From Swiss-Prot:
Antimicrobial peptide with inhibitory activity against both Gram-positive and Gram-negative bacteria (E.coli (MIC=0.25 ug/ml), M.lysodeikticus (MIC=0.25 ug/ml), and V.alginolyticus (MIC=0.25 ug/ml)). Does not show hemolytic activity. Residues 1-11 form the signal peptide. It is found in: Secreted; Target cell membrane. The keyword Zinc does not apply. Residues 46-71 form a propeptide. Keywords: Antibiotic, Antimicrobial, Disulfide bond, Immunity, Innate immunity, Membrane, Secreted, Signal, Target cell membrane, Target membrane. It comes from the Eukaryota. This is Equinin B. Contains 4 disulfide bonds.
Length: 71
């Protein structure tokens, strides 16, 4: 699974938080988890959420990670 690596301490915290969050949200769906983690990182690191979702245009769930539903 490709996870965005960030060298800052903040990035490590985001990675742990997002991996835990997305594993709970998408326990059986690797694609869901991957999208969730990518979005979660964007929010966590303060990037524009729209840019995090550009490669997922077919995915209608462009919402805050804590509202992300498992499908």
């Amino acid at each position: 699974m490709a996870v965005i690596m960030v060298d800052q301490a903040e990035g490590g915290q985001c990675q742990r938080k997002c991996l835990g969050h997305c594993s709970k949200k998408c326990p059986k769906h690797p694609q869901c988890r991957k999208r969730c983690i990518r979005r979660c990182f964007g929010y966590c690191l303060g990037d524009e959420p729209q840019q995090m979702a550009l490669d997922d245009e077919s995915d209608p769930l462009v919402i805050l990670p804590n509202n992300y539903n498992d499908y």
